């Protein structure tokens, strides 16, 4: 099974409570059911000097919380990953 780091390059800035997506695609669901796909093509990432901010939240994120068959078809990791923000 792939790890999150090998699939998507990301930077976490806990002092600002934000998740930064640098490359790849990610599906995000938080406790308030904010939900959606966000894509950043490789070329756009390579030409950009700054990471892209997706959302900010004080609650934790659940990444890739979709069915295993859909994850396999999309080439996404099959695990569920949690990132919890602390102050």
Curated annotation (Swiss-Prot):
GO terms for cellular component: chloroplast. InterPro entries: Uncharacterised_Ycf15. Keywords: Chloroplast, Plastid. Its main location: plastid. It is found in: Plastid, Chloroplast. Belongs to the ycf15 family. This is Putative uncharacterized protein ycf15. It comes from Nicotiana tomentosiformis.
């Amino acid at each position: 099974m792939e790890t999150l780091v090998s699939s998507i390059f990301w930077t976490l800035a806990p002092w600002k409570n934000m998740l930064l997506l640098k490359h790849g695609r990610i599906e995000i669901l938080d406790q308030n059911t904010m939900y959606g796909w966000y894509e950043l093509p490789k070329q756009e990432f390579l030409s950009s000097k700054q990471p892209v901010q997706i959302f900010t939240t004080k609650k934790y994120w659940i990444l890739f919380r979709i069915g295993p068959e859909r994850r396999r078809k999309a080439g996404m990791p099959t695990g569920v990953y949690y990132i919890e923000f602390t102050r």
